[in-house]
Amino acid sequence: MSTICPPPSPAVAKTEIALSGESPLLAATFAYWDNILGPRVRHIWAPKTDQVLLSDGEITFLANHTLNGEILRNAESGAIDVKFFVLSEKGVIIVSLIFDGNWNGDRSTYGLSIILPQTELSFYLPLHRVCVDRLTHIIRKGRIWMHKERQENVQKIVLEGTERMEDQGQSIIPMLTGEVIPVMELLASMKSHSVPEDIDIADTVLNDDDIGDSCHEGFLLNAISSHLQTCGCSVVVGSSAEKVNKIVRTLCLFLTPAERKCSRLCEAESSFKYESGLFVQGLLKDATGSFVLPFRQVMYAPYPTTHIDVDVNTVKQMPPCHEHIYNQRRYMRSELTAFWRATSEEDMAQDTIIYTDESFTPDLNIFQDVLHRDTLVKAFLDQVFHLKPGLSLRSTFLAQFLLILHRKALTLIKYIEDDTQKGKKPFKSLRNLKIDLDLTAEGDLNIIMALAEKIKPGLHSFIFGRPFYTSVQERDVLMTF
């Protein structure tokens, strides 16, 4: 790492985090704009290592760089700007989220950033969306925290007359620490256990001599079908790391290379935590043979998820995209409302409770059986196991199958665009679409719609959203009688 001259500034508070394995992250920082001194760093989080790659002064210099030029920032209220810096001369990349907030009695500009070596650029890019989503929600909670702390400190000043304004907002740091550590742990686990970009089909179930050698035929069909219906997002749990990882690799065959790099294998010694935003992840059960998925993280996943248990051969799935996004937004709003109404730091720090209010009570039974059968995956499995294993034939046949799915998804998108004049008119008939595109099987339609959703986000809500919202409103009205 090249030498950087740190600015003459007072020492910045720092928290060192003990992580298992190698951490690709150099540091995370929380900075703010001081109207007199310019950009200043409030806190640094860094992995605890024997070798210091960046000094505190260097980290401070880099973090200050993210707020340079933000003095004239004129963003909408509540806006969060994502900045991506590649500083080749310094050998680092910086991902910074810039936002406005109230602290020390004044409205100012803040930056929450993570710093990585430039050599980790290819590793980080597939995980960029995951990290930005995490940091964005941290900022949502941080804004509420800062505002509440400011109100409390102002009350202390009025009542006691002894508090100083400079101390306001200090307790936001413990809250940020509790939120930043999981992001650092996620990146460390992905560094050591991410799924490789190229998967050898010999390490998957598709290399078996016959269907059913490694797992039951119906289980494999349901697992792959539901995996595709939930936009390629699945969590695989079990007691054997080898068995779990074999299913993880099998499901990752149906993902793009970039999506595979955003998937994680199971750790043999101990189980990782569930992480929202990953496409496929393997998790070990505990000594009692159970595994509990955290409700909050599952709800915050960008796509619905398939739950696969390799011990008992069960496959469950969440509701489709439009329903998942609807529930996710209501839950997020409910959580932030509860955070705002909290009367103590213990309540504000509580992250495991299920938030409810008068208008929304989340359904804890979010996983359901695979209700809709398909013909696409069934035909693929029937044919692929007729090919001789151990050769490249099955890999080629899989590539052809994925190409067909992609073409069908593009055709569906064009069909909807032409029928609605690119969204200017409401969609007329789902029945005609299913007949014209040969998607009469409900499972086939779900698979192609899920793939089309990734190509053109929002398509699910455009087609299914209005009748779903209407049914929800009708249900709410009926429940009032």
UniProtKB/Swiss-Prot annotation:
Q: Which InterPro entries match?
A: C9orf72 (IPR027819)
Q: Does the keyword Lipid metabolism apply?
A: no
Residue ranges of domain cDENN C9ORF72-type in the record: 200-343
Protein role: Acts as a guanine-nucleotide releasing factor (GEF) for Rab GTPases by promoting the conversion of inactive RAB-GDP to the active form RAB-GTP. Acts as a GEF for RAB39A which enables HOPS-mediated autophagosome-lysosome membrane tethering and fusion in mammalian autophagy. Component of the C9orf72-SMCR8 complex where both subunits display GEF activity and that regulates autophagy. As part of the C9orf72-SMCR8-WDR41 (CSW) complex, functions as GEF for RAB8A, and RAB39B, thereby promoting autophagosome maturation.
- Segments carrying the region annotation (Required for the homodimerization of the C9orf72-SMCR8 complex) are 461-481
Protein name from the UniProt record: Guanine nucleotide exchange factor C9orf72 homolog
A biological process (GO) of this protein is: negative regulation of immune response
Which stretches make up the dDENN C9ORF72-type domain? 370-464
Give the classification, highest ranks. Eukaryota, Metazoa, Chordata, Craniata, Vertebrata
Q: Where is the uDENN C9ORF72-type domain?
A: 23-194
The main location class comes to nucleus
Tissue expression: Expressed in postnatal cerebellum and cortex (at protein level). Neuronal expression is detected in several regions of the adult brain and spinal cord. Prominent expression also observed in embryonic and early postnatal neurons including retinal ganglion cells, sensory neurons in the olfactory epithelium and in dorsal root ganglia, and spinal motor neurons. Expressed in the developing cerebral cortex, cerebellum, olfactory bulb, hippocampus and spinal cord in the embryo and in P0 cortical neurons and astrocytes. Also expressed in non-neuronal tissues such as kidney and tooth.
The record's gene field reads: C9orf72
- Subcellular localization, as worded in the UniProt entry: Nucleus; Cytoplasm; Cytoplasm, P-body; Cytoplasm, Stress granule
Subunit structure and binding partners: Component of the C9orf72-SMCR8 complex, at least composed of C9orf72, SMCR8 and WDR41. The complex is formed of two protomers, each individually consisting of one molecule each of C9orf72, SMCR8 and WDR41. The protomers homodimerize via an interaction between C9orf72 (via C-terminus) and SMCR8 (via N-terminus). Within each protomer SMCR8 (via DENN domain) acts as a bridging protein between WDR41 (via C-terminus and N-terminus) and C9orf72 (via C-terminus). The C9orf72-SMCR8 complex associates with the ULK1/ATG1 kinase complex.
